[in-house]
Amino acid sequence: IDYYPLNMSQISSLKNLKSLCKDMENGKIDKLFILGANPVYDSPSDLGFAESLKKVKNAVHLTNIIDETSKLCSWNIAMNHYFECWGDAMTYDGHVSIVQPQIMPLFDSRSVIQVLSPIVYSLEQSAYDTVKNVWKSTIIKSGNFEREWEKALHDGLYKRPILKKVNVKPISKVSTAILNDYSLDNDMFEIVFTPSSSVYDGRYANNGWLQEIPKPVTSLTWDNAALISMKVAKKLNIKNGQMLEINVGNNSIKIPAFITPGQNQKSITLELGYGRKFSGRIGNEVGFNVYPLRDSNNPSFVLNGSINVLNETYPLASTQDHHGLEDDKYAAPGFDDLANNCLLYT
């Protein structure tokens, strides 16, 4: 295994977002550029991004769709599609590549580089010129620049890595003390958040083809659900599609249950990316928004969530139920034995 150093200061974090929200709330931010993101919808609820954004006098949103964040911004700028953009990228081992557009922009739109260039360099220039100038000053510092630049354009990759391998000594002993902070109270659950396999974090919610794709394990389409174990379902008498109220601290959501073999009995899995209000004609009001339960301290999971079983049901579409025989009077007697042998019970 090879290890390469990465400059982590260049990677944004929730800590930065939390600091930004605090500054917006205190009126310290007069102008804000939001580049291709939708934090009003997908930022952790404890940050209160939407309310803080309302206190910014001039908020500019570079976006390819009018979404939840666009509605609270003063200005919206049409963003280029990825296939219309110049840029660059770096692999984990330090090789760099030039991102070249496949087509000219179809509309009067802008890329992230075009928006930032006048701000960073006090000079309005094309995205191509910006990328080329950056490479000249940081990547190809010696030799015949034009020749090396043209070769990188042709090959698609600059074959001299800019990162050097480092020697890493493995930790001889790992402390388990950190696990003491992650304990569950009785009758409480760990709530795990996972990106959707079809709409990811919600950015693809308006794509009907992706909404139609059955999800792994559950085969659900056009919806998300709270994945619970069979033991919990039996204990609380929960059926597929029965509405649950899930509470974490002062926040709560309503979402249908889906019984999932193999799910840990103390864990509930919630899929992100649904419940959009401004994603487009196809994606609006599809599924349930679970972002209100996320916390900036642990955005991947939260502890000590509770559930209330509601006397409501919601129809869920799962392709795995097609051609089911469990209700057939001839097949039903042997179904329980077959299920016990084939499924993973926890």
Predicted regions and their residues:
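A cross-kingdom feature strongest in bacterial/archaeal respiratory oxidoreductases
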Residues: 3-106, 136-344
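Non-catalytic, well-ordered alpha-helical segments in soluble enzyme domains
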Residues: 111-136
